[in-house]
Amino acid sequence: MKVRPSVKPMCEHCKVIKRKGRVMVICSANPKHKQRQGK
């Protein structure tokens, strides 16, 4: 899980979602693409 100031989809499988007020990226193909916005 990467924590970044700005999250962007890295491939066509990445989905941008919102959980508990945080913007996150989840990826079915590559788990390395998981990201979360904020500190």
UniProtKB/Swiss-Prot annotation:
GO terms for biological process: translation. It comes from the Bacteria. One of its GO terms (molecular function) is structural constituent of ribosome. GO terms for cellular component: cytoplasm; ribonucleoprotein complex; ribosome. PROSITE patterns: RIBOSOMAL_L36 (PS00828). The keyword Ribonucleoprotein applies. InterPro entries: Ribosomal_bL36, Ribosomal_bL36_sp. SUPFAM superfamilies: Ribosomal protein L36 (SSF57840). Coiled coil: none annotated. Keywords: Ribonucleoprotein, Ribosomal protein. Belongs to the bacterial ribosomal protein bL36 family. PANTHER family: 50S RIBOSOMAL PROTEIN L36, CHLOROPLASTIC, LARGE RIBOSOMAL SUBUNIT PROTEIN BL36C. This is Large ribosomal subunit protein bL36.
